[in-house]
Each structure stands twice: as C-alpha cells, then as structure tokens.
Regions:
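Conserved glycine-rich cofactor-binding loop
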Residues: 11, 18-20
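Substrate-binding pocket helix/loop in short-chain dehydrogenase/reductase
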Residues: 102-103, 107-115, 141, 212
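Alpha-helical segment proximal to the catalytic Tyr-Lys
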Residues: 131, 177-178, 240
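Active-site helix of classical SDR
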Residues: 126, 164, 172
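Residue(s) in the substrate-gating loop at a strand-loop-helix junction
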Residues: 146
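Conserved glycine-rich Rossmann-like NAD(P)H-binding loop of the short-chain dehydrogenase/reductase
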Residues: 34-48
C-alpha cells in the first residue's frame, strides 16, 4: 500500500529553524527522512541544530544564514541549497517576530519592522523558491500563520502581529491560485499560542494563562510536537488536492 505521507528524500527548506516552531518542524521532517536546509540568522544555533539532526536522525542536513527581510540574503541562501541538492520540494516559512503592544504604545518603526519580517519575509521567500518550484513543476509551500488572522486575541495588543498574519493568509490564497497549474500547493498552518522562545514573555504576563483557559476549550497552550502531523501532511502527497487553506491547530479556539 502506498504511503501517502512519505517525504523521505524530499528537500525541505525551513526558515526560522534556529528555534521555536521552525526548529520543531525541521526535526519532524528529519524523523521522516527528508533532506533539510535550515535557514535563520543565528549561525551558532544553526550549527548546533545541524549537529543534533545528524546525530539523532542521520539524515542529510545543511544550513544557510539568512535574513528573510533581505531579498539578497534569501537568494544567496537558496542558491546554496540548489548547489547542494539541485531542487527544493518543500518550503516552510516559520521565521517571525513577536510584538505585544497596544497601538498607542507602538512606534511606527516597530509596526513597519513587524510587517516587513512577518509578511514581506514570507512573500520574499515564496517568490525566490517559487521560481524554482515552477520550473520543476512541483512544490509544497507551508506558511506559518496564526489563528489571530481569523480571531482577535481577547487581551488585545497584537495589532501588528495579527495584521501581518492576516496578510500571510491572503498571500497564501493568492499564490495557491496562481501556482496551482504548476502542481504547487500553498497552505498555512494557524497555531494558537504554543510554548516557544517567541511567546515566553507573553505567557509570563499576569492574567495571560487565565485568558488561555477562558478562550481555548482545551484550556492550555500548544505543546512541542503538536504541529508535526499537520506539517508532514501538508508537505506530503497526502495533501495533493489541498491548497489555499488555513488549517488551525488551536485546541478548539476557533470553534467557538
């Protein structure tokens, strides 16, 4: 029987792979035998993660220092992957930043920086890798969105974040339509709040966990590994007819 979830030997580029959700997804792909290219800005952390994947999973892995807000940095990193592997089958856009401030406490520069990294960075990565996928007539793009592109966080203070993620969702839909003729699927995963380096400051705020328990039917944060299944599904041929979707992994948050 065919294994529809097989991604063994597929080449996967994962941004934000030095920590957080990007690193978790990279490990999930390594466990399935994918060939990995880890992108992030922190070279020392990338080197540590490459060594850990080689030791734990024995799969092929490389890294490239990459700033997703800099298109020249992206094209150089993508060229490095093509030199090593000759193709890119999967792209996961997990790089991002956090900013929990009410509008009146947020500078215009902070707003623009957030939109630049969380939205423009995804656009730049999709454009650079999409060119390769169009030429090879195949590709799987997975953008890390958020449930807060669909529902507003009850505590407020995430206008830049949720606006950027709303843009990511609309970009996902547009690319899904444009690139469907090339056998490229483009989808987004919409996590609720997960335990990562990006969210630790928010989690420690007074009353934060009370909000989580009030609005998330599961009554808790997402845990490491709980995005692995959906990330593998969207990277595999099991999802060949699924494109332009936001799939929320949120403990039931968006069900109410």
């Amino acid at each position: 029987m065919k294994n529809y979830f097989d991604i063994k030997d597929k080449v996967a580029v994962v941004t934000g792979a030095s920590s957080g959700l990007g690193w978790q997804i990279a490990q999930a792909y390594a466990s399935q035998g994918a060939k990995l290219a880890l992108f992030a800005r922190r070279e020392e952390r990338l080197q540590e993660n490459v060594a850990e994947i080689e030791k734990e999973f024995g799969t092929e892995v490389m890294y490239a220092v990459c700033d997703v807000g800099d298109y020249d940095s992206i094209t150089a990193a993508v060229a490095k992957v093509m030199d090593a592997y000759g193709r890119i089958d999967i792209l996961v856009n997990a790089a991002g930043m956090g900013n929990n401030k009410p509008v009146m406490d947020q500078s215009n520069d902070e707003w623009e920086r957030h939109i630049h990294i969380d939205l423009s960075g995804v656009y730049y990565m999709c454009k650079a890798v999409g060119e390769i996928m169009i030429e090879q007539n195949y590709g799987k793009i997975i953008n890390i969105g958020s449930i807060h592109s669909r529902v507003i966080f009850p505590g407020g203070g995430i206008s830049a974040y949720s606006s950027a993620k709303g843009g990511v969702m609309n970009l996902t839909k547009n690319l899904a339509v444009e690139w469907a003729p090339y056998n490229i699927t483009v989808n987004a995963i919409g996590p609720a709040v997960f335990e990562t380096e990006l969210t630790v400051d928010s989690i420690e705020l007074p009353g934060f966990m009370d909000l989580i328990k009030a609005y998330c039917p599961a009554g808790r944060l997402g845990k490491p590994g709980e995005l692995d299944g959906i990330a593998i599904y969207l990277a595999s041929d099991a999802s060949i007819f699924c494109t332009g979707q936001l799939i929320c992994i949120d403990g039931g948050w968006t069900a109410i």
